[in-house]
């Protein structure tokens, strides 16, 4: 009886895999509402990861792939996000004070209520990133450089006059 059941199960699994049905993909990392001060997430594939309301002060996320990630309300004081891919990421209500965004690609990210204070944005690409006028004005005051990935000027990507 057990052999018959095992054989039937094996046959069903073989049939499913031959039809293109695969096991479920691993879920994206979720570290929301965590204290991650000084954490090292550099050069990692963090696509779709969730860092909502996490404290990432002094964290190193440089060179990481954060496409589609959610950093809603994250505290990113003095964090290193240089060279990160933040396309289509949610940054709304994040606090970026002293944050390094050099050469980051933020194209299509949502950052309307994000606070940018004393940030480094040399070479960052902000194409199609909605943000408040006061934040845009402060970023335009320090915008310079060309993004090495997209070839866009930081000033142009922000729409600075």
Where are these regions (language model features)?
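Tandem repeat scaffolds
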Residues: 2-9, 13-161
